[in-house]
UniProtKB/Swiss-Prot annotation:
This is Nitrogenase molybdenum-iron protein alpha chain. It comes from the Bacteria. The keyword ATP-binding applies. One of its GO terms (molecular function) is nitrogenase activity. The gene is nifD. It comes from Anabaena sp. (strain L31). Tetramer of two alpha and two beta chains. Forms complex with the iron protein (nitrogenase component 2).
Length: 23
């Protein structure tokens, strides 16, 4: 996995975690 893809996945994961915490 290339670093840019990894950064994007980390960003998506953070957003998903925020959604779960809000729920």
């Amino acid at each position: 996995m290339t670093p840019p893809e990894n950064k994007n996945l980390v960003q998506e994961n953070k957003e998903l975690i925020q959604e779960v915490l809000k729920a």
